[in-house]
């Protein structure tokens, strides 16, 4: 949004962003064994993992239904220049390979530096690792904004969040239960609040458009949260 104001489609506002809010709430309840079930520790167990995967299947069905109906109307300014299929496949494979290996090197290097400074693994995961694994989304969304394809920019972020919570965490927890460790309810609440902020900004402000000042506000909120995590160390 700082690069180029992002207009949010009606379907995104009424269905997809609420899905992100729902995914955050589902994760909050799945990860709160101590508060809700009087358990000994907060853990995302196998049953929780299956619940998350069930929501992922619902999300897939919704996505396929949209695809069959042709999706939202695309304005002239959002049309993407056609590219030969072979070239598209080549770009996808090459880009994925670069992102996978580059992201792995970034995360390993950043984690090594953080551990040498005595920073906890939960803070590493919430800041450096999260930032490193989000670089592909950042690059994709910024590029889409520069090419005036706001639907791709915001859809990339929403889809990534839903995929990570429902599928990645769902698969991981189903294979092996995931203790929450140093991640507490404040972190989960911040995640829910960020999704609500995106919905409120898009719905109540200027013509369902996330403007540059609002983009700056979101960045300031993230910097403040990161500073809080570091200060707690």
Residue map of PLM features:
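Hydrophobic alpha-helical segments, chiefly the membrane-spanning helices
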Residues: 1-233
């Amino acid at each position: 949004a700082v690069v180029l104001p992002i207009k949010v489609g009606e379907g995104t506002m009424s269905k997809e962003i609420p899905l992100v809010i729902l995914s955050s709430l589902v994760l909050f309840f799945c990860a709160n064994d101590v508060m809700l079930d009087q358990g000994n520790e907060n853990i995302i167990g196998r049953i929780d993992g299956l619940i998350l995967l069930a929501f992922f299947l619902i999300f897939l069905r919704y996505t396929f239904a949209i695809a069959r109906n042709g999706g939202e109307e695309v304005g002239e300014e959002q049309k993407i220049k056609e590219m030969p299929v072979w070239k598209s496949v080549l770009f996808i494979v090459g880009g994925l390979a670069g992102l996978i290996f580059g992201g792995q090197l970034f995360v390993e290097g950043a984690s090594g530096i953080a551990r040498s400074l005595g920073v906890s693994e939960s803070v590493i995961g919430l800041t450096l690792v999260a930032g490193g694994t989000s670089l592909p989304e950042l690059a994709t969304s910024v590029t889409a904004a520069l090419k005036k394809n706001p639907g791709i920019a915001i859809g990339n972020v929403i889809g990534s969040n839903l995929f990570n919570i429902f599928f990645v965490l769902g698969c991981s927890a189903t294979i092996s239960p995931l203790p929450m460790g140093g991640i507490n309810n404040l972190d989960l609440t911040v995640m829910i609040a960020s999704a609500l902020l995106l919905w409120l900004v898009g719905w109540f402000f200027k013509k369902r458009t996330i403007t540059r000042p609002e983009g700056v506000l979101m960045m300031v909120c993230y910097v403040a949260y990161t500073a809080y995590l570091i200060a707690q160390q």
